[in-house]
Amino acid sequence: MKLVQNEITGSLGTNPSIELKARLEQDRILGRVGGALMAKELALEVSEKGVSGRVGGKNGFDVSLELKAGELSGFVGLETLHLRGVDQVTGRLGNTLGGVDFIANQNADSLRGRLGGIKGQTFELELAGTPGWIGTLVAVIAFYALERHKN
């Protein structure tokens, strides 16, 4: 039986940009974020209850998100995450004082978004049929993995 793969490719930030590559294989999100020197492996399970998994292997961090009332809520590493929406996605990574708001909009197979305010980082992804919330989740996790989790 051949697995259906939906490739997610794109970048986060501009100078320099962070490469994002992931694929959806049935109920798993697998991929790699970052370049050759700072790359982190991504392995997440998607279920009716939420998303869970690990990023960065042994020295990485856990992802544990629960689906409640149309919102994914939980933890990415030590930070809280709240993510709402499917093709128009909004949310927040972190607490009230040090957190980062994000927004993303899907148009067909393209996803464009921003983490943070005016000086925040933009991201652009090609989704190849994958829902926008998954692309946004990959971008937010990449941001945390490469900008906030220093291991």
Task: List the predicted regions and their residue ranges.
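Long terminal segments
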Residues: M1-A43, S47-S52, K58-N151
